[in-house]
Amino acid sequence: MATDDSIIVLDDDDEDEAAAQPGPSNLPPNPASTGPGPGLSQQATGLSEPRVDGGSSNSGSRKCYKLDNEKLFEEFLELCKTETSDHPEVVPFLHKLQQRAQSVFLASAEFCNILSRVLARSRKRPAKIYVYINELCTVLKAHSIKKKLNLAPAASTTSEASGPNPPTEPPSDLTNTENTASEASRTRGSRRQIQRLEQLLALYVAEIRRLQEKELDLSELDDPDSSYLQEARLKRKLIRLFGRLCELKDCSSLTGRVIEQRIPYRGTRYPEVNRRIERLINKPGLDTFPDYGDVLRAVEKAATRHSLGLPRQQLQLLAQDAFRDVGVRLQERRHLDLIYNFGCHLTDDYRPGVDPALSDPTLARRLRENRTLAMNRLDEVISKYAMMQDKTEEGERQKRRARLLGTAPQPSDPPQASSESGEGPSGMASQECPTTSKAETDDDDDDDDDDDEDNEESEEEEEEEEEEKEATEDEDEDLEQLQEDQGGDEEEEGGDNEGNESPTSPSDFFHRRNSEPAEGLRTPEGQQKRGLTETPASPPGASLDPPSTDAESSGEQLLEPLLGDESPVSQLAELEMEALPEERDISSPRKKSEDSLPTILENGAAVVTSTSVNGRVSSHTWRDASPPSKRFRKEKKQLGSGLLGNSYIKEPMAQQDSGQNTSVQPMPSPPLASVASVADSSTRVDSPSHELVTSSLCSPSPSLLLQTPQAQSLRQCIYKTSVATQCDPEEIIVLSDSD
């Protein structure tokens, strides 16, 4: 009998819950619960009369719950109207969900409890009204009447079997009552299990709260039975219990989390592939993150099933794009779910304005230190595995390169030697020849492996780019040095216009003359071309080569009419205008510049010509320069007449004695060196230990490269630069014009 009493209490559980609720009035006692033993046995065996009595009592309690639920629902809608005035579609949406819900659920104590809780929390926290609206919508959708219509096709059969004017409402009521009766019998049969599972859920929730409030020591991190792991195990059990409870109650297990939302995918142009990928990422069960292989297999299956006829390379591209898009979408969904569900019951009462770290500086400092420590450790882990990945990729690249070099070996020393000895296009041509031959041999050997060929070509292109960068850097350094010398020449040109020159030491001249052969040895081609214009210096009795002798005689013949007809100023202006196109050729290859300027020193000046005591030109002077012209010999004769003892004093020229002042009009200077004043301007060196030095610069335009060596020797004799170009620009000293 004790068991019968307990069973009766479980059957009338709705009445007990109704009595516990504050809303409805006290219900009349059920006569079946106080009846004698035969009545109990009849109810237990399932006779018809006790069922009718129980049905009448249940119908009365349902009517009371239904009225109370309608009242609470109307109050909630009024609250939603005031709080969601910006979104007027919320209230009609809730009305629609209520109409679609099951009548049994609308008249149940569960719905009454949900409405009471949602209404109380909404009044307490109006800012979270949409959260509670979402909770109510989830419950109403879970108890929607759509599922019950599919399970009861008897209504359609009865309507077909009836006459032309059948009564539609009574059959629907009958089917509803039958469904509710069968549902009640089924739920009553498992009510004991439901009650037991609910008790277990309450026990698990209390234990999880206790473990969350417990402090976790660092020594417990390696403990397999730490409080954190216990909490995780209890949460997994609680999820399984919740799923089982939803099955017994015949309701949906969806809780409205972001992670439960379905992700639509429209990333590709093929609907079949989109459907397959969408089915993959929305697969029920655990939230598993698909990898690239899963996405590729899904794309291949869709292409094979629907005969898309796509090549494998295009399938791989589709899979790569889809994997990136799917990964971003899944990551965003997980991040939002973490934000919405982060924390525990300890953070339920948290408000942004009552953060304890705002009032406690020690706590705020500790939180900042912990955050910094966490970010540093995270960066260390990421950098560690990134370096491991880089090392692995580098090792694979080296193995592949060794394998390629083993199939087609090529010597690597000739390109390096050519890059060191020759600069410019000639050097680059010598470097590109081995690489192109290497590419041809690799194409012949590895025609079947497309990936290896692509990698090899990319590596060759990188090597060529590095070699080109080195060559351009050398050219830029030389151009910068020449520009600095040009700036020094321009400064000295202003001093020459005033009639002053700075003294220079002979050691600088000899040092630069000794460095000249090193510049001349850069390219063999430059040496060969330089040999065409050079005249070796020899004693007076030595025999000269016929070409050099002809060049000297022709140069003298060309120079005499120029000197006799035109003034030095007009000659210089014409030659400067001819040299102007050379400004556009600054960025021309080094090969052309070196071939056209065989005797240029490091600082941009020409070969130093020194005058000895007896007025003759020393034998080492014309090693790399053209022979002196007739005018130059006349100047040295005049200089020789003014020598006094050990001092070298240059007397004024005939033009300055006559009062003629030579001035250079401001013209754009050549790119390699600035043109100084004319050679017959007054120059004076006060130091007795210095020699008279004049430097000539040959800067013909590219159009004059194919002319005869006589014209080049003529230009070398006429173009004069300042003495200051032979020394450092910082060491220029402007002397006074006092006699």
UniProtKB/Swiss-Prot annotation:
Residues 441-499 have a biased composition (Acidic residues). Residues 173-184, 611-620, 655-666 have a biased composition (Polar residues). It is found in: Cytoplasm; Nucleus, Nucleoplasm; Nucleus, PML body; Nucleus, Nucleolus. The modification Phosphothreonine is found at residues 472, 523. Residues 185-223, 364-403, 445-488 form a coiled coil. There is a cross-link at residue 630 (Glycyl lysine isopeptide (Lys-Gly) (interchain with G-Cter in SUMO1)). Signal peptide: none annotated. Sumoylated with SUMO1 on multiple lysine residues. Repressor activity is down-regulated upon Ser-669 phosphorylation. Upon neuronal activation dephosphorylated by calcineurin in a Ca2+ dependent manner at Ser-669; dephosphorylation positively affects histone H3.3 loading and transcriptional activation. Residues 353-576 are annotated as: Necessary for interaction with USP7. One of its GO terms (molecular function) is protein homodimerization activity. Homomultimer. Interacts (via C-terminus) with TNFRSF6 (via death domain). Interacts with PAX5, SLC2A4/GLUT4, MAP3K5, TGFBR2, phosphorylated dimeric HSPB1/HSP27, CENPC, ETS1, sumoylated PML, UBE2I, MCRS1 and TP53. Interacts (via N-terminus) with HIPK2 and HIPK3. Interacts with HIPK1, which induces translocation from PML/POD/ND10 nuclear bodies to chromatin and enhances association with HDAC1. Interacts (non-phosphorylated) with PAX3, PAX7, DEK, HDAC1, HDAC2, HDAC3, acetylated histone H4 and histones H2A, H2B, H3, H3.3 and H4. Belongs to the DAXX family. Transcription corepressor known to repress transcriptional potential of several sumoylated transcription factors. Down-regulates basal and activated transcription. Its transcription repressor activity is modulated by recruiting it to subnuclear compartments like the nucleolus or PML/POD/ND10 nuclear bodies through interactions with MCSR1 and PML, respectively. Seems to regulate transcription in PML/POD/ND10 nuclear bodies together with PML and may influence TNFRSF6-dependent apoptosis thereby. Inhibits transcriptional activation of PAX3 and ETS1 through direct protein-protein interactions. This is Death domain-associated protein 6. The lineage of its organism: Eukaryota, Metazoa, Chordata, Craniata, Vertebrata.
